[in-house]
């Protein structure tokens, strides 16, 4: 018997992945690099530590990943605050159905907790979730998640 439903966030609940390529390409240009779209796409679903290691391996140790993540947070937050959280079609209806069936729900994501909470607040979905687990809360993120 199914007792709970666990959702991934980026790409499943919210269409935030479409912001990743232009955001990271903007950041890399500002820092003096050119980041191919394919490189950004390979970031999807992975934790910050693993992505940062790949960035440094690919672009060099001098790539300031800490600044890159700060800029990413700033640019994505600015976009979402201006345009709203891009919900995937049918999400609210699905969540209502799951609640009607009495099932618990949770989010499992590599996104930082403060951003998850911000997106949920902006989209009005906070009350639909019973728990959140982020990549920072587990010892090993994708591709071998705990």
Language model regions located:
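Active-site neighborhood of HAD-like aspartate-dependent phosphohydrolases
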Residues: 1-41
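Structural signature of beta-strand start/N-cap positions in the alpha/beta core
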Residues: 3-4, 96-97, 104, 130
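Short beta->alpha linker loops
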Residues: 19, 43-47, 71, 86-90, ...
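Alpha-helical substrate-recognition element adjacent to the catalytic core
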Residues: 22, 30-59, 68
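Hydrophobic packing residues within well-ordered alpha-helices of enzyme cores
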Residues: 24, 52, 91, 116-120, ...
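A short, Lys/Arg-enriched amphipathic alpha-helix followed by its capping loop at the start of a domain
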Residues: 26-31, 93-103
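Metal-dependent phosphoesterase signature
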Residues: 34, 56-92, 101
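Substrate-recognition "cap/lid" segment bordering the active-site pocket of phosphatases
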Residues: 85-86, 106, 112-146
